[in-house]
């Protein structure tokens, strides 16, 4: 058995920077199966358990060991650069473990250089796969941020069977996302640490399919929305503990305002229509927060966007165009179809959030596949906007220049490394996009 497993281990190794072959995938699956069987046989022998029970125990033990190994590896900042038409862009993915003011990370339950991978589905203390994602351009001798947001896994610890613990866990994860959002706004964070009660606007864009027909993403979306609702009652002040520059825990006061969306982006949503109605019941309310009660494309934006535009900011035209595009998509239900651009609504919501000085946050179930594609779509469009000073029209395919930007972003956005951090292998398993 051990000789066979050694051969499988050798076959399972991917020996170059390329996708695994079918033979390597089969060897990896066979190795996992044999390891679980070996643990089961040992458990049966030692503890006298029935075969079925021993196998169940072995499968859980194997998964727990996998999670522990992935969580305990170093989680470090990923930084990549790309050049297009003479401009130099930097993509940065900063993990929760490196969100620091002093020597330690800012979270009350410290990460200590480690992380929480997407497979840690019972964790009720930390958000899964929590990163701050930034794209900047080097101009006039300094770096200018084009976009910054927070990405993570679903707020639901969905394998926790106790409903009370699951809800507590979802709220703890939401608090970590809010803490990361505050960290992404240094001026606001400094005010909070100085004792001021600060208002924090967050646009949360879930990318799940809000249905339980295949998988349980419908329940996960409910858990996530419930967590946001519990933390953002009108006028509610919440207290977060943040580790300051001296390494001491300090209580800060924030008034969170969250516009919580969910936009299905995979085939189950966009080809089969699963979860669209449930998602849009959340989206209608969030759009009113963001754009006011009159969602006709020709109407002047209200809500958060209206407040921003009333200041006549430098980015007036970009904000107005994004708002109009979002209302057009909504009116025509374009977000219910792929149309060659599955992320059309989700991407524009995140971009609009950033432009009006709110914090964009987005997530799928794991925080790596759909979340990673969304990350790349946002960065592609921001680099394109910086190059051409024009926003793409919804449903339009990138021209050859846009395609080149996208290829560079896909390879240099940090998403391949995040995939490897969570699974041990780089790549992306998004259902056709």
Curated annotation (Swiss-Prot):
Residues spanned by motif CX5R motif: 364-370
UniProtKB keywords: Hydrolase, Secreted, Virulence
InterPro entries in the record: IpgD/SopB
Alphabetical list of Pfam families matching this protein: IpgD (PF05925)
Record: active site: 364
Keyword presence, Repeat: no
One MF term in the entry's GO annotations: phosphatase activity
EC assignment: 3.1.3.-
Gene Ontology CC annotation, any one: extracellular region
Localization of this protein: Secreted
Signal peptide residue numbers: none
Keyword Nucleotide-binding attached: no
Family that this chain belongs to: Belongs to the phosphatase IpgD/SopB family.
NCBIfam families, A to Z: PRK15378.1
Domain free text: Contains the consensus sequence Cys-X(5)-Arg characteristic of Mg-independent phosphatases.
Function: Converts phosphatidylinositol 3,4,5-trisphosphate (PtdIns 3,4,5-P3) to PtdIns 3-P and prevents the transition of PtdIns 3-P to PtdIns 3,5-P2. It is one of the known effectors injected by Salmonella into the host cell and is required for invasion and for an efficient generation and maintenance of Salmonella-containing vacuole (SVC). Alteration of the phosphoinositide composition of the plasma membrane causes membrane ruffling and actin cytoskeleton rearrangements.
Name this polypeptide is given: Inositol phosphate phosphatase SopB
């Amino acid at each position: 058995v051990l000789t066979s497993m050694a051969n499988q281990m050798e076959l399972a190794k991917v020996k170059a920077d390329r996708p695994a072959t079918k033979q390597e995938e089969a060897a990896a699956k066979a190795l996992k199966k044999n390891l679980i069987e070996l643990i089961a046989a040992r458990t049966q022998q030692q503890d006298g358990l029935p075969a079925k029970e021993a196998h169940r125990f072995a499968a859980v033990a194997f998964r727990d060991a996998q999670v522990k190994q992935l969580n305990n590896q170093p989680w470090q900042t990923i930084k990549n650069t790309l050049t297009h038409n003479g401009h130099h862009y930097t993509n940065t993915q900063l993990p929760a473990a490196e969100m620091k003011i002093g020597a330690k990370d800012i979270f009350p339950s410290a990460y200590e250089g480690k992380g929480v991978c997407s497979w840690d589905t019972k964790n009720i203390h930390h958000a899964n796969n929590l990163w701050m994602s930034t794209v900047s351009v080097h101009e006039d001798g300094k770096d200018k941020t084009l976009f910054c947001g927070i990405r993570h896994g679903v707020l639901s610890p969905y394998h926790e069977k106790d409903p009370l613990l699951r809800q507590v866990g979802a709220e703890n994860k939401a608090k970590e996302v809010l803490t990361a959002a505050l960290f992404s706004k240094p001026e606001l964070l400094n005010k909070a640490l100085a004792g001021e009660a600060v208002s924090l606007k967050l646009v949360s864009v879930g990318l799940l399919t809000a249905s339980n027909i295949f998988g349980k993403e419908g329940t996960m979306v409910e858990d996530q929305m419930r967590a946001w609702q519990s933390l953002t009652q009108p006028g509610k002040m919440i207290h977060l503990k943040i580790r300051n520059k001296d390494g001491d825990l300090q209580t800060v006061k924030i008034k969170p305002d969250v516009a919580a969306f969910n936009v299905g982006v995979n085939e189950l949503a966009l080809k089969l229509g699963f979860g669209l109605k449930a998602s849009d019941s959340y989206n209608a309310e969030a759009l009113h927060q963001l754009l006011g009660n009159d969602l006709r494309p020709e109407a002047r934006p209200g809500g958060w966007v209206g407040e921003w535009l009333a200041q006549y900011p430098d980015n007036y035209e970009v904000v107005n165009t994004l708002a109009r595009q979002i209302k057009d998509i909504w009116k025509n239900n374009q977000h219910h179809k792929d149309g060659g651009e599955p992320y059309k609504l989700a991407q524009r919501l995140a971009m609009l959030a950033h432009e009006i000085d709110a914090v964009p946050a987005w997530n799928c179930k794991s925080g790596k596949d759909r979340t990673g594609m969304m990350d790349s779509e946002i960065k592609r469009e921001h680099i394109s906007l910086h190059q051409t000073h024009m926003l793409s029209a919804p449903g339009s395919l990138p021209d050859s220049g846009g395609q080149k930007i996208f290829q560079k972003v896909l390879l240099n956005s940090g998403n391949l490394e995040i995939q490897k951090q969570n699974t041990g292998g780089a790549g992306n398993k998004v259902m056709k996009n």
